[in-house]
Amino acid sequence: MENKLSNIWKCFLPSVCIFVLQMAISFVGMFFVFCYKAHTYTSGSFSDFFQGYYNAVTSTDFNVGVMLVYAAIAAVLFFFWYYKKVCDKSAKKGAFALLKANPATCIVGVILLSFGMQYLCTYLMNVVSCFFPNWLPQYETLMDGRGLSGSRTLPLVLYTVVIGPICEELTFRGLTFSYARRVMPFWAANVVQALLFAGMHMNPLQAVYTFLFGLVLGYFVEKAGNLSMGICLHMSFNAVGVLSGGLALGGNGPMQFFCILFGSMVATYLGILLLNKNAKNMA
């Protein structure tokens, strides 16, 4: 009973650590910006100084910098936690066993699933925002703050496509899912990690599609027996959303809307089919 309770609270601990680390890095960053602004400030009123400081700590560059630093630190810390306490080092499946089973099929499956889910998530957000219109401005403000609605800078791409997915996979599909899996059936553990993954984004509209995507990631991590497939899928999904610009939006009329929606459903289905086929060949 004690071991069960220990695993239950441990499955929530990574999310708490992520939140605390984000806050800590933000405050440290704000402190350094304040010191820099105070050191370089020469003239003007206090309100001018405060306005300049406020503009700096709410800027896209500051937000992206904080996310990049926290994700890099969390990825290193959680890697050692996962490797030392959770990872099954005696597992027969290698880190990229699912990919090696049939590389071409796996790569095509990842690409199809990434593109398909990007479109589906976009349409899902549009539908949800019709029922909850107040959620859309919150989401747009969040995306503006993270620089995802403007030009794609190198730090932003590095965080969104590389460091962020590694950090989040170690946190949710690595630690959270693994601890939950010790005391719960797969479906329950998958729902728990997906809910925490959605909650981490702290935006109701984004939480809707990140929950759905989290379920898919958890499913393939379970299939692969390790984090490699989750990381690959997460990187690919984010890369499509960030690097393709407006590609994941679509539909100027009902017919085009339907065709793109249907095509995204087919792409998602084929992607899942190909990756499942690879998993069976690996077994």
Segments (PLM) and residue ranges:
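Short, amphipathic, aromatic/basic-enriched membrane-interface segments that mark the entry/exit
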Residues: 163, 174-184, 199-205, 228-231
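Membrane-spanning helices that line or support transport/gating and their immediate boundary helices
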Residues: 27-35, 123-131, 170, 179
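N-terminal, membrane-interfacial amphipathic/helix-forming hydrophobic leader that caps
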Residues: 1-107, 115, 239-283
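Juxtamembrane helix-loop-helix connectors linking adjacent transmembrane helices
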Residues: 42-46, 51-57, 89-164, 182
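Membrane-interface helix/loop boundary segments of multi-pass membrane proteins
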Residues: 167-192, 219-226
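Functionally important transmembrane alpha-helices
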Residues: 23, 27, 31, 194, ...
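Alpha-helical membrane-protein architecture signal
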Residues: 5, 9, 13, 104-108, ...
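Transmembrane alpha-helix boundary/anchor motif
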Residues: 23, 27, 115, 119-123, ...
